[in-house]
Amino acid sequence: MFKSVAKLGKSPIFYLNSQRLIHIKTLTTPNENALKFLSTDGEMLQTRGSKSIVIKNTDENLINHSKLAQQIFLQCPGVESLMIGDDFLTINKDRMVHWNSIKPEIIDLLTKQLAYGEDVISKEFHAVQEEEGEGGYKINMPKFELTEEDEEVSELIEELIDTRIRPAILEDGGDIDYRGWDPKTGTVYLRLQGACTSCSSSEVTLKYGIESMLKHYVDEVKEVIQIMDPEQEIALKEFDKLEKKLESSKNTSHEK
């Protein structure tokens, strides 16, 4: 569920260049393996309102078009993906890696990025991203035709997501991408990103937060489904296996 609880990192880092002092803070997210990094002065990484950029450590071609991503993946082993928002950076790490081993380096790289004001991605990034697809994977999305009336419903859904739902998710270091609405089944298709990826509470957020709100305001909405790529599906299955294994071990120890 949306927590939107911000906790300051214990060791903020300052970076001074010839013009200004940059102060970076870290905020916790509902996902213990994701942290949100941002400037206390509101320094921007992208134009406000821009669509968040997600880069995984396996996206070699995309990494080559982002100096910040190159440096983070090279100098911070264990970082699985990063999401660049308009004024924040969300880092997802491997659950076996401790934040203390990578957080200072990430903060240092981000402070330098903001201090020098360089573009976070190259001009060719979006063209490469479109050519690559979503992480090199083909995501199965049903195709459906919309009448003029259906288009109005779809626009209403998108407006609700952008104005009522997306701000809360961005605050927690994630993002949401509206992929469409099937008028025949009433199904809304969404893609969660950033801190929402591989988060144990993402399904709760989806069903009891997003789905409930959309159903309340739009009668035509019957269900909300999250679109995932193969890597996300595998990660969630492995997480479920681990939870069951831990629960089984706990029960066994109690029996003894």
Curated annotation (Swiss-Prot):
General function of this protein: Involved in iron homeostasis within the mitochondrion where it is involved in the assembly of iron-sulfur proteins. Together with BOL3, required during the last step of iron-sulfur protein assembly when the iron-sulfur cluster is inserted into the target protein. Required for protecting iron sulfur clusters from oxidative damage.
Reported phenotype of the disruption mutant: Cells are impaired in growth on synthetic complete medium with acetate as a carbon source due to defects in mitochondrial [4Fe-4S] cluster formation.
Description of how the protein assembles with itself and partners: Homodimer; in absence of BOL3, probably bridged by an iron-sulfure cluster. Interacts with BOL3. Interacts with apo-target proteins, such as ACO1, LYS4, ACO2 and SDH2.
Domain characteristics, as noted in the entry: The CxxC motif may bind a [4Fe-4S] cluster.
Keywords: Mitochondrion, Transit peptide
SMART domains, A to Z: Nfu_N
Domain of life: Eukaryota
Listed name of the protein: NifU-like protein, mitochondrial
A GO molecular function held by the record: iron ion binding
GO biological process: [4Fe-4S] cluster assembly; iron-sulfur cluster assembly
Extra information: Present with 11300 molecules/cell in log phase SD medium.
UniProt family annotation: Belongs to the NifU family.
